[in-house]
Amino acid sequence: MGKLHLYSGRRKRFPEKLSWAAVEGGVELEEAKAFMLSVWNSDEKSTKCIELWTKDMSMDEMKIFFHQTLLSMTETFQRATGDENMSATMQDFCDYFAEKLELRK
């Protein structure tokens, strides 16, 4: 079974440093400015989330991070459900999101 390790130098509201390792995936120890993890609780039918970002992550980086996360979720939804129509709708939203944040110039 693979393991993911997250290291957070969390002080007060924002961690000063984030790093992670996934040895089986070839990542020994890599720094990151943001991290999101969602887990599904089947008994409660609810999602639990951990969202962390460092104090030095810029607003522009956060916008790009969210956009790329939404794109990844869209791809995962398509693979998991095969629902072409909703996947296209989600992709439309990703395009709208990027346009409104002026991410694609």
Residue ranges of model-derived segments:
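C-terminal charged interaction modules
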Residues: 74-105
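Active-site- and interface-proximal helix/loop "cap" or "latch" segments in soluble metabolic
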Residues: 17-80
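Short, acidic, Ser/Thr-enriched surface-loop or helix-capping motifs
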Residues: 9-10
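Structured beta-strand/loop patches that form or line metal/cofactor-binding pockets in enzymes
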Residues: 1-4
